[in-house]
């Protein structure tokens, strides 16, 4: 196995009223607010074909996560037995990549308004992908 490192460059940041990961919803459908994805101008051409109403998968880097954690109580509830992080949606994990299903509300230049996003303000954006139908 090749363990060579590699670099990911954020393409933008989240603007959200959420500021504390501890009090943010665990999933967007659990009360995640509308938020803005603010993209770097260098990637704006990549938005071609994205429209209001489109469902997207947003990939983020959960920069406040603890990358040393390998076992957690699911949903941070100590009444739940400990599990390995790869069997949970915990942000704490060796490579804290966030996966967020969102819907585009509006697009204003480099700013995309999306619904139901549980990511906190300032979270780096790695990528956006369309949700595709069944093949």
What are these regions (language model features)?
Residues 1-101, 105-135:
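Glycine-rich, low-complexity intrinsically disordered segments
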């Amino acid at each position: 196995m090749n363990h060579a490192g590699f670099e990911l460059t954020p393409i933008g940041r989240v603007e959200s009223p959420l500021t504390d990961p501890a009090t943010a919803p665990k999933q967007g459908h659990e009360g995640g607010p509308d938020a803005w994805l603010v993209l770097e101008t260098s990637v704006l051409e990549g938005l071609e074909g994205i429209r209001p109403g489109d469902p997207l998968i947003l990939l983020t880097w959960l920069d406040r996560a603890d990358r040393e954690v390998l076992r957690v109580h699911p949903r941070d509830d100590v009444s739940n037995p400990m599990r390995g992080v790869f069997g949970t949606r915990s942000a704490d994990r060796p490579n804290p990549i966030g996966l967020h299903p969102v819907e585009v509300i509006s697009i204003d230049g480099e700013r995309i308004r999306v619904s139901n996003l549980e990511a906190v303000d300032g979270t780096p954006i790695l990528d956006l992908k369309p949700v595709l139908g069944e093949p």
